[in-house]
């Protein structure tokens, strides 16, 4: 396997998490997503709930407030500390074993490695809304709000910590539209690229 590590960034509702999990199962490699949260919490001393809410997403306040609030004398915030712990864990996991890592800016964190396939999964809005309503058992209006809010926070976090644009094709090896290709085809394409 030329590419040992697969990172999957994704739009909310695109099925990126599901696709990544299926790829890991089919390849027989480790899968890291929310299971990283416990490690981050343990090493940072913060609660898993706090990590769940803040490790991949920017706080619910605006990007300006995110950039300047709650920083110590060195200029570091709690979010910066969490990001640094998360970064170190991702680097350790990449050294340890072949794996699929979902989100958490892993594509950027591992950008200097030659054995990484960076994938961005996106989808058509109607299909994403339909998937969110089904998975989370919410009305369409709530699904739209969830989709917009979560992607906005993912983008703010990614753009802030990487100085790159979230979802921009140049930042990834492969960009796949799960609505157009379907999950099975996305999985096959990813596996063909490693």
Q: Can you annotate each of these PLM segments?
A:
Residues 41-98:
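ATP-dependent small-molecule kinase phosphotransfer cores
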Residues 93, 109-112:
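RNA pseudouridine synthases
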């Amino acid at each position: 396997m030329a590419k040992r590590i697969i990172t999957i960034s994704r739009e909310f509702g695109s099925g990126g998490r599901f696709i990544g999990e299926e790829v890991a199962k089919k390849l027989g490699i480790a899968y890291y997503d929310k299971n990283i949260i416990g490690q981050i919490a343990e090493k940072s001393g913060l609660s898993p709930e706090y990590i769940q809410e803040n490790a991949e997403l920017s706080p619910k306040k605006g990007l300006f407030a995110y950039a300047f609030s709650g920083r110590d004398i060195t200029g570091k915030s709690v979010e910066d500390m969490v990001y640094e712990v998360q970064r170190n864990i991702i680097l350790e996991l990449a050294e340890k074993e072949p794996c699929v890592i979902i989100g958490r800016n892993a594509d950027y964190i591992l950008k200097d490695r030659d054995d990484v396939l960076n994938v961005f999964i996106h989808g058509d809005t109607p299909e994403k809304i339909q998937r969110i309503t089904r998975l989370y058992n919410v009305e369409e209006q709530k699904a739209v709000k969830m989709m917009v809010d979560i992607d906005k926070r993912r983008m703010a976090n990614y753009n802030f910590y990487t100085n790159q644009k979230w979802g921009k094709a140049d930042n990834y090896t492969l960009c796949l539209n799960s609505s157009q290709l379907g999950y099975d085809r996305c999985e096959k394409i990813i596996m063909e690229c490693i």
